[in-house]
């Protein structure tokens, strides 16, 4: 039986640098608003939410900006020549998995992305989601 639960995911950023200048998934939040308006129950996991309760405490700059939590990762082949560290920015994987375990099983999962260049964030999130919910549609 369908429960009309939708999980919304704003995934990590993979890049050489990223900084939180009030980055919020406005498009995804708008979709969530309309889904709730029409009777769906929504849950949001924002991997870029520096203040998520499962994350380590982060320092805040003036006006709420600040550094994302970052985890060094291997560079894609095409970027190996760039002499800079390549990182996954956003919540630790353990925090993501804990957040997933705290919500009821959804009927569908929606994953967003800020730009094509950051494809690795959605790709990694979808990989984890397919392992946890192999039978669910992921859009």
Named regions from a protein language model:
Residues 1-139:
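A short, structured N-terminal alpha-helical element that caps or precedes a catalytic domain
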């Amino acid at each position: 039986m369908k429960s009309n639960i939708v999980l919304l995911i704003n995934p990590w950023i993979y890049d050489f640098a990223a900084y939180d200048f009030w980055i919020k998934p406005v498009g995804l939040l708008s979709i969530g608003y309309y889904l709730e308006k029409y009777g769906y129950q929504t849950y949001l996991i924002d991997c870029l939410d520096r203040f998520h309760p499962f994350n380590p405490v982060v320092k805040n700059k003036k006006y709420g900006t600040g550094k994302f939590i970052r985890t060094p990762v291997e560079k894609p082949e095409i970027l190996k020549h760039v002499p800079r560290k390549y990182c996954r920015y956003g919540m630790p994987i353990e925090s993501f998995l804990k957040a997933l375990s705290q919500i009821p099983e959804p009927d569908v999962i929606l994953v967003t992305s800020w730009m094509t260049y950051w494809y690795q964030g959605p790709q990694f999130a979808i990989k984890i989601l397919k392992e946890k919910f192999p039978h669910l549609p992921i859009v």
